[in-house]
Amino acid sequence: MAVKHGVDGDGSEIESRTLAVDRKSGFCESTSIFYSKREPMALPPNQFLDVTSFIASQPHRGKTVFVDAVTGRRLSFPELWLGVERVAGCLYALGVRKGNVVIILSPNSILFPIVSLSVMSLGAIITTANPINTSDEISKQIGDSRPVLAFTTCKLVSKLAAASNFNLPVVLMDDYHVPSQSYGDRVKLVGRLETMIETEPSESRVKQRVNQDDTAALLYSSGTTGTSKGVMLSHRNLIALVQAYRARFGLEQRTICTIPMCHIFGFGGFATGLIALGWTIVVLPKFDMAKLLSAVETHRSSYLSLVPPIVVAMVNGANEINSKYDLSSLHTVVAGGAPLSREVTEKFVENYPKVKILQGYGLTESTAIAASMFNKEETKRYGASGLLAPNVEGKIVDPDTGRVLGVNQTGELWIRSPTVMKGYFKNKEATASTIDSEGWLKTGDLCYIDGDGFVFVVDRLKELIKCNGYQVAPAELEALLLAHPEIADAAVIPIPDMKAGQYPMAYIVRKVGSNLSESEIMGFVAKQVSPYKKIRKVTFLASIPKNPSGKILRRELTKLTTSKL
């Protein structure tokens, strides 16, 4: 078995390592490392290369790249790249330079990738904000990333204004009427995206040299410590993601985009990776099951990228769906965000026998790449997330002792690959605790790798809650709860849900004399957070179990919850 990942030197060194690697599992006894069984992917040697130029240079025969599912507007590949070049010229004229941060607050749109690709082509950094986030949440992101410019829609400009505490220049992404209300000195409207797309650059801009190691995107994640941090993804990270997609998927396919482009799953696929493969991407502004299925039928989609709750919904509504929609063009569902159970997978295949489900596993910190399934045969390994992706190395580490483990032993998964992030933005301490000196990313997930090299995710060591594919940090919700005048103590844990995967649940200790109710607590939190962060269940306790150092014993609470389900 040829193993080339992370190996320097001549062929004899590679060969000597090859002899120590188990062909079935990919495990090397001498290094205690699992090596990918996939064919290694080639990465461009040119150090001075931005991801936009790399994507634009990829060979394919695709004609239409984006279709607006609502309006029917289509963008060809030449129109995409002309738009990217023109918007980049306008951004340069506005003073955007290499290293500057530009924020985009927008639902899915066929124009979203034009913005992100043009920003990255300048060597500037795109940061994405979720439209369903509250103004307070967006304000924290703005305060941390300090953008020099924002792109948003007319409907969201008021939310952006509420989130900004300085005169943030804004470019509007649509042509709807902007309310005449004043936004004070919080935002300054400086242009419209459609005008930029039609504008020839007025001056010959000096193109700054972009290094593959420069930061291209800043996506916010709860990380491994539970507080939101900016994940710095380099041009090299995104180029490696494109090559991983090329190894996994065919060229010139058709798909529907419903996953938010602000999320790594959507950004990596629909705003970067799949463009390089010549795919046609039909864009829905937000998820709607009927519109999704109708789009599959109308546009003859061959692939769908879905989060587990949507897969579950398709299983539960299979009879009606199959009688109402023609899904004969669909042959592959790519599932990510959380593992699918064997029961759900089997029922899906039973109801949609011509469709295979390819599961995958990744993090924002790994540019969404870690493990994946490539073909129908691999889908039969129920519960698995697939094999380690090309060029990915893995280690299983005992979280208590630090001892490196082997095949079929459960511990924290560490990975090393060209897709591992540069680090957390302006947070050296968090970066050092997440990536070690040898480049190993500590995923915070308890996993094991079986004798055939398949990765199984067992639990979340890092305690994050995954609700509808989004990360929810218990610490954030606990801080909110403890701010309530009638709450003495609080702990938040996940509660399993067939559709959402998990929901946040709170254990509450009321202050003496308080009669605070479950509904009052849920309402208190709901007013301050995004929908996926809402508390869905409350249980009252006399005290929260903690260890001597004061750390919440979440596993004890999980046991208590499980016993009551």
From Swiss-Prot:
One of its GO terms (cellular component) is peroxisome. CDD domains: 4CL (cd05904). GO terms for molecular function: 4-coumarate-CoA ligase activity; ATP binding. ATP binds at residues 221-225, 229, 359-360, 364, 445, 460, 551. Its EC number is 6.2.1.12. PANTHER family: 4-COUMARATE--COA LIGASE-LIKE 2, LONG-CHAIN-FATTY-ACID--COA LIGASE. Its cofactor is Mg(2+). It comes from Arabidopsis thaliana (Mouse-ear cress). This is 4-coumarate--CoA ligase-like 2. It catalyses: (E)-4-coumarate + ATP + CoA = (E)-4-coumaroyl-CoA + AMP + diphosphate; (E)-4-coumarate + ATP + H(+) = (E)-4-coumaroyl-AMP + diphosphate; (E)-4-coumaroyl-AMP + CoA = (E)-4-coumaroyl-CoA + AMP + H(+).
